[in-house]
């Protein structure tokens, strides 16, 4: 079992229950899933781009990504309905906890010119979204084999009802928010 999951069960649940005055431990917010999304507009012209992005995402997440397709045709972007334009992975359970551990302790500290995560990136319902500009911050990606530096969106979905509860949950995991 992931260390972060044990830490959550043993320490964070008790802290948050005390802080917010929950009557039951089942009311304490928990992380439900982490979604990684990589939008690849250039995949329309070159299919190899999508394959490379899928390989990178498989290495980062530890599971095969799903190819996302265009829902509508947009002439301005030269895409038609059904064209592959990205890939995404939804992590739950054990893989989610292991990824979160790697994200907090290894990947985020490797970001260049890092000044902290934006505390305003909560959506109002207790979910947090962040962008990563380069996939090479993850140790699983070999810098020499990368054809192009790509970014991705990381969304952390929690069971929290408010932003304050979600912020307290992520703070308990030592997320490096800006002060």
Swiss-Prot record:
Query: Which pairs of Cys residues are joined through disulfide bonds in the record?
Result: none
Instruction: Tell me yes or no: is rRNA-binding among this UniProt entry's keywords.
Output: yes
One of the record's GO molecular function terms? structural constituent of ribosome
Provide the alphabetized UniProt keywords: Ribonucleoprotein, Ribosomal protein, RNA-binding, rRNA-binding, tRNA-binding
Q: Which domain of life is it from?
A: Bacteria
Q: Name one GO biological process term.
A: translation
Q: Which GO terms describe its cellular component?
A: ribonucleoprotein complex; ribosome
What residue ranges are annotated as transmembrane?
none
Pfam families in alphabetical order: Ribosomal_L5, Ribosomal_L5_C
Q: Which SUPFAM superfamilies match?
A: RL5-like (SSF55282)
Establish whether keyword rRNA-binding is in the entry. yes
> What is the stated purpose of this protein?
This is one of the proteins that bind and probably mediate the attachment of the 5S RNA into the large ribosomal subunit, where it forms part of the central protuberance. In the 70S ribosome it contacts protein S13 of the 30S subunit (bridge B1b), connecting the 2 subunits; this bridge is implicated in subunit movement. Contacts the P site tRNA; the 5S rRNA and some of its associated proteins might help stabilize positioning of ribosome-bound tRNAs.
Q: Which PANTHER family match?
A: 60S RIBOSOMAL PROTEIN L11-RELATED
Complex and partners: Part of the 50S ribosomal subunit; part of the 5S rRNA/L5/L18/L25 subcomplex. Contacts the 5S rRNA and the P site tRNA. Forms a bridge to the 30S subunit in the 70S ribosome.
Q: Which family does it belong to?
A: Belongs to the universal ribosomal protein uL5 family.
Q: What is the name of the protein in this document?
A: Large ribosomal subunit protein uL5
- Which species does this protein come from? Alteromonas mediterranea (strain DSM 17117 / CIP 110805 / LMG 28347 / Deep ecotype)
Which gene is annotated as encoding this protein in its UniProt record? rplE
């Amino acid at each position: 079992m992931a260390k972060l999951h044990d830490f959550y069960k043993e320490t964070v649940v008790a802290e948050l229950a005390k802080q917010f005055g929950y009557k039951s431990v089942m009311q304490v917010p928990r992380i439900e899933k982490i979604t990684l999304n990589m939008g690849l507009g250039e995949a329309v012209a070159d299919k190899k781009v999508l394959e490379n992005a899928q390989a990178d995402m498989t290495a980062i997440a530890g599971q095969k990504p799903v190819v996302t397709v265009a829902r509508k045709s947009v002439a301005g972007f030269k895409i038609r309905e059904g064209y592959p334009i990205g890939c995404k992975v939804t992590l739950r359970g054990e893989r989610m906890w292991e990824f979160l551990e790697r994200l907090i302790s290894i990947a985020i500290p490797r970001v260049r010119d890092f000044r902290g995560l934006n505390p305003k990136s909560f959506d109002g319902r207790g979910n947090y979204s962040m962008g990563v500009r380069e996939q090479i911050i993850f140790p699983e990606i070999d810098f020499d084999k990368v054809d192009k530096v790509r970014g991705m969106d990381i969304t952390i979905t929690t069971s929290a009802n408010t932003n304050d509860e979600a912020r307290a949950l992520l703070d308990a995991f030592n997320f490096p928010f800006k002060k």
